C-alpha cells in the first residue's frame, strides 16, 4: 500500500481551527448519519453539520490548501475533493473496521485523507489503523499533518481512551482511478522535476515530460 503523509497547515492554524470547532455548540451531529449501511453500527463520533457556516468556511480552506500544494497534486491528481467533514471523538468513541463507499453522492472515492487537527498528546488512543496483507499500520500524526491513502483499504479508528480527537476527513476523486497507475505517474513526475531542478531544461527532459503528459491522457478519466 502506498500512502503519503504531509504537513498541510501550521500547528498554530490547526489550533485555531480546533478552538473554532470547540466554540461551535449547535451544529454537531451523530456520526452514524454519514456512515454506509455496513459501517453505521461500528461508528461512534460527532460530525460538524456539513451545511453549517463554519463547516463550509473551514472546508474551503482545507480544499484550497490541498489543491495549491504541488506535492499533493502530483500524488493524487485530483479531479474532485469531496465529502470533507470535521469530526470530534470523545472518550469511548471509535470506528470499527470498514471500507469507504466506492461511490458517494458527492463523487467517487479513489483516495481517502485524514488531517489531524490537535496534538497526539491531547488524547490517548484514536489511531487511524490501515490494514494491509501482513500488518496494520497505526497512524497518529502531529497537528496540521495529514495522511492520504487508497480508499480500497480496510481501516478503522481505535477507541479514544481519554481526551478529545479532532480531525478533518475527506475523499479525492482522481483523474487516474487505478492506484498503481497513479503511483507510477507520481514517480515519473517526481523524477523529471528532480532532474529539472538539478540540471535545468534539456531536450531529453522535454521528452520525459511529453511521455508523462501522454500517459496521463491515456490513463485518465
UniProtKB/Swiss-Prot annotation:
**Main EC class of this protein?**
oxidoreductase
Residues forming the Fe2OG dioxygenase domain are: 80-174
Which keywords label this protein? Dioxygenase, Iron, Metal-binding, Oxidoreductase, Vitamin C
Recorded E.C. number(s)? 1.14.11.-
Q: Which GO terms describe its molecular function?
A: 2-oxoglutarate-dependent dioxygenase activity; iron ion binding; L-ascorbic acid binding
Domain of life of the source? Bacteria
Summarize where Fe cation binds, as residue positions.
98, 100, 155
Query: Which InterPro entries does the record match to this protein?
Result: Oxoglu/Fe-dep_dioxygenase_dom, PKHD_hydroxylase, Pro_4_hyd_alph, Pro_4_hyd_alph_FE2OG_OXY
The residues listed in the UniProt record as binding 2-oxoglutarate, with positions renumbered to this chain, are 165
Q: Check the record and name the PROSITE patterns matching this protein.
A: FE2OG_OXY
Q: Which GO terms describe its biological process?
A: DNA damage response; intracellular iron ion homeostasis
Cofactor: how and how many bound: Binds 1 Fe(2+) ion per subunit.
Please tell me whether the keyword Transport is annotated for this protein: no
The Swiss-Prot or TrEMBL record lists the needed cofactor(s) as:
Fe(2+); L-ascorbate
Q: Which PANTHER family match?
A: PKHD-TYPE HYDROXYLASE YBIX
Q: Can you name this protein?
A: PKHD-type hydroxylase PMN2A_0775
| Organism the protein comes from | Prochlorococcus marinus (strain NATL2A)
Taxonomic placement: Bacteria, Bacillati, Cyanobacteriota, Cyanophyceae, Synechococcales
Amino acid at each position: 500500500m502506498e500512502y503519503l503523509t504531509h504537513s498541510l497547515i501550521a500547528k498554530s492554524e490547526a489550533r485555531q481551527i480546533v478552538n473554532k470547532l470547540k466554540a461551535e455548540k449547535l451544529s454537531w451531529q451523530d456520526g452514524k448519519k454519514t456512515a454506509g449501511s455496513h459501517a453505521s453500527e461500528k461508528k461512534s463520533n460527532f460530525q460538524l453539520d456539513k451545511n453549517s457556516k463554519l463547516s463550509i468556511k473551514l472546508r474551503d480552506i482545507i480544499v484550497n490548501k490541498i489543491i495549491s500544494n504541488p506535492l499533493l497534486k502530483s500524488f493524487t491528481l485530483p479531479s474532485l475533493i469531496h465529502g470533507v467533514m470535521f469530526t470530534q471523538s470523545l472518550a469511548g468513541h471509535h470506528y470499527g473496521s470498514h471500507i469507504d463507499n466506492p461511490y458517494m453522492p458527492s463523487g467517487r472515492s479513489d483516495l481517502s485523507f485524514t488531517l489531524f487537527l490537535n496534538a497526539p498528546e491531547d488524547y490517548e488512543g484514536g489511531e487511524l489503523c490501515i490494514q494491509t496483507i501482513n500488518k496494520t499500520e497505526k497512524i497518529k500524526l502531529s497537528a496540521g499533518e495529514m495522511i492520504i491513502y487508497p480508499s480500497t483499504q480496510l481501516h478503522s479508528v481505535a477507541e479514544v481512551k481519554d481526551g478529545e480527537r479532532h480531525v478533518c476527513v475527506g475523499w479525492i476523486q482522481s483523474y487516474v482511478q487505478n492506484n498503481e497507475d497513479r503511483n507510477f505517474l507520481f514517480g515519473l513526475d517526481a523524477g523529471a522535476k528532480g532532474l529539472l531542478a538539478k540540471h535545468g531544461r534539456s531536450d531529453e527532459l522535454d521528452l520525459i515530460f511529453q511521455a508523462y503528459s501522454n500517459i496521463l491522457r491515456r490513463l485518465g478519466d
